[in-house]
A protein has these predicted regions:
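Alpha-helical substrate-recognition element adjacent to the catalytic core
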Residues: 2-113, 117-118
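Alpha-helical segments flanking ligand/cofactor-binding loops in enzyme cores
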Residues: 78, 138, 157-158
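Acidic, Mg2+-coordinating phosphoryl-transfer loop and its flanking beta/alpha structural elements
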Residues: 86-91, 145-186
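An extended, acidic
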Residues: 94, 161-163, 196-200
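Short, well-ordered alpha-helical microsegments
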Residues: 94-98, 156-157, 192
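Substrate-recognition "cap/lid" segment bordering the active-site pocket of phosphatases
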Residues: 95-147
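Short, acidic/turn-prone active-site loops that include or flank metal/cofactor-
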Residues: 111-116, 171-175, 189-191
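Short, charged, surface-exposed secondary-structure boundary motifs
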Residues: 117-124, 176-183, 193-198
Length: 200
């Protein structure tokens, strides 16, 4: 019994923080897990910048409302779900992801939650579990699933390497060079074909 686990940002939707960096004119916020492998460190750094600029959840949600899935993402997901169970596993937060999930046809999403003050300031974040992507894949394997995983960043490598089949998708040249043993794809058609082959 196979289940496909996909990263979200950079794979199905644009990077939320890059979009917000551009909308807010704060280029430092363009740093993502492609650049910083330590997610806690990255998020705490981001929250510090938001506080410094007096920005909160409302401003980020206004940017997210204007974001559409990457071209072809919805069709890819719809096709994938015809032959595999699919779970999206992301280090993003429910307060960010909901409008994007609607545009993707409400797939199952495992993510985290933000701690938000009454005035909208993001005061912290609550991760569902340590190493959420790897932990989720291992938990699925423990109940009889073979997992197939794909993502683009450092924080996807654990679930990719622990799965029966794993693929990089639209990753960086550095990650592809550092992990040449992981097949890397650039188009949804290629990724769909690789997942189909893995399930055969």
């Amino acid at each position: 019994m196979y289940i496909t686990c996909l990263d979200v940002e950079g794979v199905l939707v644009p990077e939320i923080w890059i979009a917000f960096a551009e909308a807010s004119g704060i280029p430092e916020l363009k740093k993502t897990t492609r650049d910083e492998p330590d997610y806690d460190k990255l998020m705490n750094w981001r929250l510090g910048i938001l506080k410094e600029h007096g920005l909160g959840l409302k401003e980020i949600q206004e940017t997210i409302a204007k974001i559409d899935p990457l071209p072809g993402a919805r069709e890819f997901l719809d096709e994938l779900r015809t032959f595999s169970q699919v779970i999206l596993i992301s280090d993003t937060f429910t307060q960010f992801a909901t409008p994007l999930m609607e545009k993707l046809g409400w797939p199952t999403l495992f993510c985290n939650s933000l701690e938000v003050a009454e005035d909208g300031e993001i005061t912290g974040f609550k991760m569902r579990v340590e190493q959420s992507k790897l932990s989720t894949v291992k938990a699925l394997q423990s109940i009889g699933f073979d997992t197939i995983a794909s993502g683009d960043s450092y924080n996807d490598l654990g679930m990719i390497q622990a799965s029966k089949a794993g693929f990089l998708f639209r990753s960086t040249d550095k990650i592809k060079a550092d992990y040449p043993q992981i097949p890397a794809y650039e188009t949804y058609e290629e990724l769909l074909g690789a997942i189909k082959d893995a399930i055969k």
